[in-house]
Amino acid sequence: MAEGLERVRISASELRGILATLAPQAGSRENMKELKEPRQRKDNRRPDLEIYKPGLSRLRNRPKTKEASGNEEFKDEIVNDRDSSAVGNDTQLIQVCKELDSQQQNGPIDAENSQAQETFPKTVGLEDRSLKIIKRSKKPDLQIYQPGRRLQTITKESAGRADEEEILNQVEQLRIEEDECKGEAIKEEVNNKPDKTEIEKHQSNDRVRTAKGEKGKKIEKGEGSKKVADDSVPGKPGSVKRYSRSDKRRNRYRTCSTSSAGSNNSAEGAGLTDNGCRRRRQDRAKERPRLKKQVSLSSTDSLDEDRVDEPDVLGSRRSSERKKHLERNWSGCGEGEQKSNGKENRSALRVTFDAETMSKDSPVVRSVKDNVDRMKSDKGPSSGGKGSEKQELRHPRQELRDRGRGILILPAHTALSVSSSGSPESTPLGPRLLFGSGSKGSRSWGRGGTTRRLWDPNNPDQKPALKSQTPQLHFLDTDDEISPTSWGDSRQAQASYYKFQNSDNPYYYPRTPGPASQYPYAGYSPLQYPVGPTNGMYPGAYYPGYPAPSGQYVCSPLPASTMSPEEIEQHVRNMQQQELHRLLRVADNQELQLSNLLSRDRISTEGMEKMAQLRTELLQLYERCILLDIEFSDSQNVDQILWKNAFYQVIEKFRQLLKDPNSENPEQIRNRLLELLDEGSDFFDSLLQKLQVTYKFKLEDYMDGLAIRSKPLRKTVKYALISAQRSMICQGDISRYREQANDTANYGKARSWYLKAQHIAPKNGRPYNQLALLAVYTRRKLDAVYYYMRSLAASNPILTAKESLMSLFEETKRKAEQMEKKQHEEFDMSPDKWRKGKKSTFRHVGDDTTRLEIWIHPSHSRSAQGTESGKDSEQENGLGSLSPSDLNKRFILSFLHAHGKLFTRIGMETFPAVAEKVLKEFQVLLQHSPSPIGSTRMLQLMTINMFAVHNSQLKDCFSEECRSVIQEQAASLGLAMFSLLVQRCTCLLKDSAKAQLSSPEDQEDQDDIKVSSFVPDLKELLPSVKVWSDWMLGYPDTWNPPPTSLDLPLQVAVDVWSTLADFCNILTAVNQSEVPLYKDPDDDLTLLILEEDRLLSGFVPLLAAPQDPCYVEKTSDKVIAADCKRVTVLKYFLEALCGQEEPLLAFKGGKYVSVAPVPDTMGKEMGSQEGKQLEDEEEDVVIEDFEEDSEAEGSGGEDDIRELRAKKLALARKIAEQQRRQEKIQAVLEDQSQMRQMELEIRPLFLVPDTNGFIDHLASLARLLESRKYILVVPLIVINELDGLAKGQETDHRAGGYARVVQEKARKSIEFLERRFESRDSCLRALTSRGNELESIAFRSEDITGQLGNNDDLILSCCLHYCKDKAKDYMPTSKEEPIRLLREVVLLTDDRNLRVKALTRNVPVRDIPAFLTWAQVG
């Protein structure tokens, strides 16, 4: 039997040698025709059902240590196969060989699958781990492909132990012969050729096995499993099952190609010869698993297309040659796994490793070793090492036999390499060619030297031809969507390229090798201060718990020589920003979850815990961004996002739950809110400390409140200070929320935080806005208006403060109107108002000052009456009787009311009256000592005045002299208050001088006033005077030329410039050198910062003011030094007034005097006549000088003379035009100046109402008639209008509700008049437009065709009928005496146009309710 086996072995080897020489010439048409013939002889079966082509099978690597013994087993099994293949029917073998050619037409035969099929494990054991060996129970020509079913065959029993020992001895002998015959490989390949009979027999034997593997017949599972279990143990006796009638034993290890033509399955291993060392090397390489190549895109590709490029050679020889080239040139990596519980294994990946690759202890190799060890342990002690290795090698073949159709997915950039440690990011060895150019070279890969490779693995340093790297191939089974994969390191090789391959964990994240974290981002360790070590390229991690960024940014370190330090810094900066962007993206995801959680109506306990966890992660992420790159955090507004996402929305949710009346546990919610606020307070305290440590600064050094510093700050410190300010604002907000949660109103702590934040960065408007909120909560309206204006007048304003100011001013307006109404009611109810000889006037402040109305009540004699030019003096005297606190409250209300009109620009017609009231109350307040207005409150008043001027300026006008009317009124109010303030300071300085003269200690310096001798009230007022002077120096265009002054009474109409001149005269006597002031710094000097400068730092209207630093000695008195600086600044300001282009002050006669032009007011000249004449003389001088210069310059030529004469004429015409204009202005001013004051002595007797008076006030008119003191004169045109309203609307049924009301009132008025005229009432008359009185209105139609004007003019003509003015009666004998007119008629109307016409004709006019109040009727 051994001789027979040797004969078969030699014959098979020689046969493969012949095929190797014939492989290059295997592409002839005759061979192609012969390849196509078997498909026609197989019962005319469909080609697509003959061979199943799923695409590619999976790859799997093999450990090197087990490969050698495995190859020896292969040789052992091959000998047995040849022994059984040598005996049989020759005719049947030839037919089977043709069928084998038919199988090979579909693609190259896969040597790995052939090897795997030959080496299935012999031990099955338990069913859940059994690997079935498929055998054929039917002839090849009777097998039919059945899709969707698994194929199983019955295996034969193994040979006896003696036969296997003899085969093993033959394998050892072959190894020895191989070592002796390495140099004679080519020669033996030519000489040693088997005979034709053996070739045909071997072809027949191989073809029978291949055909059975392709057709895939199914047998019973139980019997096949039992046979495999019996054959798994070597030497186990058993019955021999024969395949055919022949008594020859068939090979136990059949080859079946059920994967596809693209799987390149071979039929049998190559033969061995005694003299062919090269064939023996091919046989050894053939047994190694190798990488499979995809040769078909689909399982339905045409078989004819595949046959074009295939030579007509035996599949076994092709498989052997292909194994040879793979062993020499290719190495790959793959993975596979087994599935238990009795189910077949799926898609095991196989790969061939060369010696160098297998020597590496890669994770893939370790995985295969572990699998082999498990197989050994399952096999038991009776199984040898070879048996376990055979079982491992048979595993993929069994899988391929049991799989159905499938799809090969080729992801981009797939690498088949184990050069790295098995990680998914490992760099592949080089690109591979899946499809050759021209013909299908992949089909003939490894056949007769026709392989197509892009690179040589023996020369790895040589660059590949293509740079694109092929990704690892993954086979997707279409029968089962879930492909089981192993967990562990082998998972890295196939990181879920298709989405639902691993449905049990669709969110799987690939784990990196080593002790690193198994999650996408590392957990955050407790925040620490120490800075970690640096690696020379990236800055060290601020927190040791955070991973270094090197692995996240680059795959390999950059060479230090290729980049400059600037480029490295920029590169590190870019990488750091990428990390920060990643952190923000993670934070956005966390914030989205938190927002979704807070959007629920109720939050459970689990939701509270989840919310706390999300907030903690958010705080860590945001804090890390702030501490890593403060500039980036500022650009991304991380501070504000931190507060909004991690605190504000959660706090608002808790507050909403507290306000909900249906809340279940309000106390629990309040406790959680307080815990959240405490946590926020601790967090921001810690953040402030970390900012100082990280960016190396101290907050104490920047709490001086200076908006402009002498030394520029470092960039990081600047951003860190902004972040610190935001943290302080958050601290203040937390304190404010805590007070509201506890239902208390002690906002002192919150105010302290806001003030600290304001001192850090005064130009930011946010702290002022928060301080305004606290003022609103505590109902301090002046503070609220001040802080809102500060937030608007900041470098970065808070625009929402404008709406807040509007609401505040609207509320102030309502309160002011209520206060005014209350004052009038108190005055009207006073019992002795007439007994005091006082009379009321109805003159408004906006009326003409040259017109004075004296109203005399009919019940009083004239001797008891006096004159009055203002409002009721009762109110004036009442200001002095008020307490300082009440007066202060009234003044604040009036002040805010006036500024509300300036800000909203609504109701400006009454602004002069309100401004007069403000100035009166302010003047009285200044007289109190101590002043009820403190220094801080006075600064706020001056600041509000500055803001009013700043806010009312024209935005689009760039001219210096372009000022709006609102701006002039605001400037007039500010200057008026400033003049009262300066007037009070002048008086206090005189008092200080008198006090110093009376002091015996100061007899030596009687001429100078010491700063230390200032009275306390003066010290309170000096900061406000200094601040306003700074503003005037910064914005001279707003007050020079002086704006139009307000129409104020004499009591408060103070000339600003004259007052400043007096103040300058007294201020020159003050000695400000009591404490020396220095301009330059020194070691023993310290910077002197005034309190007003610190409080108003960052205020935009004051940014243009002089900001010169001042230094004093460290041992000096800072309070006196501050007053010395204020006096110095005021002296400089007063000197600047003298140095203006149009000077306002001048030093004449040893003192300062005002030279400012008189402001433009009604009834006053715009300037003195002398000033105008002086201006004209100066212009004449200029013209004369110009004429002299022009004659001198024009002497050079006649052309120049003519040009200059033309200019002279043009200038002369311009001067003449200006003179004419000035003459006209002077004429108007002279007329106004010559207009005498007019006094109207009004004794009301005739009352003339208009139509609206009867419609709206019929009852009041009836009361006037009942009083019997007045005569009611009704114009006939009024009666006609009432008839029209009463009768003309009767036919209009579509009239609205208001029209019907008017119609009804007009009807009642007509009935009232008719009833009264019928009764012959002596106090009721009717008057025509021509002045005819009627005692009856039975005939009330009047012809007015010749009359001019409208109905209002006719009504006014009725009033003029009672005005009989004669010049000899009202013209006085002296020019200084006023013109006195007597009036007994009063027009009663609400119509504004009619009132204006009446005033121009000197007709007294009042509305009916006001006249009733004055007349005390009803």
Curated annotation (Swiss-Prot):
Composition bias type Polar residues, residue spans: 102-120
Purpose: Component of the telomerase ribonucleoprotein (RNP) complex that is essential for the replication of chromosome termini. May have a general role in telomere regulation. Promotes in vitro the ability of TERT to elongate telomeres. Overexpression induces telomere uncapping, chromosomal end-to-end fusions (telomeric DNA persists at the fusion points) and did not perturb TRF2 telomeric localization. Binds to the single-stranded 5'-(GTGTGG)(4)GTGT-3' telomeric DNA, but not to a telomerase RNA template component (TER).
Record's compositionally biased regions (Acidic residues): 302-312
Cofactor or coenzyme needed: Mn(2+)
InterPro entries: DNA/RNA-bd_Est1-type, Est1-like_N, Est1/Ebs1-like, PIN-like_dom_sf, PIN_dom, TPR-like_helical_dom_sf
Organism field: Mus musculus (Mouse)
Chain positions covered by the region annotation Disordered: 23-86, 102-123, 178-402, 416-468, 820-840, 856-882
Name this protein carries in UniProt: Telomerase-binding protein EST1A
Molecular function GO terms recorded: DNA polymerase binding; metal ion binding; ribonucleoprotein complex binding; RNA endonuclease activity; telomerase RNA binding; telomeric DNA binding
SUBUNIT field: May form homooligomers. Associated component of the telomerase holoenzyme complex. Interacts with TERT, independently of the telomerase RNA. Interacts with SMG1, SMG5, SMG7, UPF1, UPF2, UPF3B and the PP2A catalytic subunits. Also interacts with the exon junction complex (EJC) composed at least of CASC3, EIF4A3, MAGOH and RBM8A; required for the process of nonsense-mediated mRNA decay. Interacts with DHX34; the interaction is RNA-independent.
Alphabetized UniProt keyword annotations: Chromosome, Coiled coil, Cytoplasm, DNA-binding, Endonuclease, Hydrolase, Manganese, Metal-binding, Methylation, Nonsense-mediated mRNA decay, Nuclease, Nucleus, Phosphoprotein, Telomere
Region (EJC-binding motif 1): 39-59
Chain's gene name: Smg6
Comp. bias intervals (Basic and acidic residues): 30-51, 64-84, 182-230, 336-347, 367-379, 387-402, 820-834
Residues with Phosphoserine modification: S331, S483, S830, S869, S873
EC class name: hydrolase
Cellular component annotations (GO), alphabetically ordered: chromosome, telomeric region; ciliary basal body; cytoplasm; cytosol; exon-exon junction complex; nucleolus; nucleus; plasma membrane
Phosphoprotein keyword on record: yes
Biased composition (Low complexity): 257-271, 417-426, 436-445
Written domain comment of the UniProt record: The PINc domain confers endonuclease activity and is expected to bind the catalytic metal ion.
Residue span of region EJC-binding motif 2: 132-152
Compositional bias (Basic residues): 278-293
Localization (cell): Nucleus, Nucleolus; Chromosome, Telomere; Cytoplasm, Cytosol
Enzyme Commission number(s) from the entry: 3.1.-.-
Positions of Mn(2+) binding: D1250, D1352, D1391
Swiss-Prot/TrEMBL GO biological process terms: negative regulation of telomere capping; nuclear-transcribed mRNA catabolic process, nonsense-mediated decay; regulation of telomere maintenance
Modified residues (Omega-N-methylarginine): R405, R432
Residue positions, PTM Phosphothreonine: T470, T478
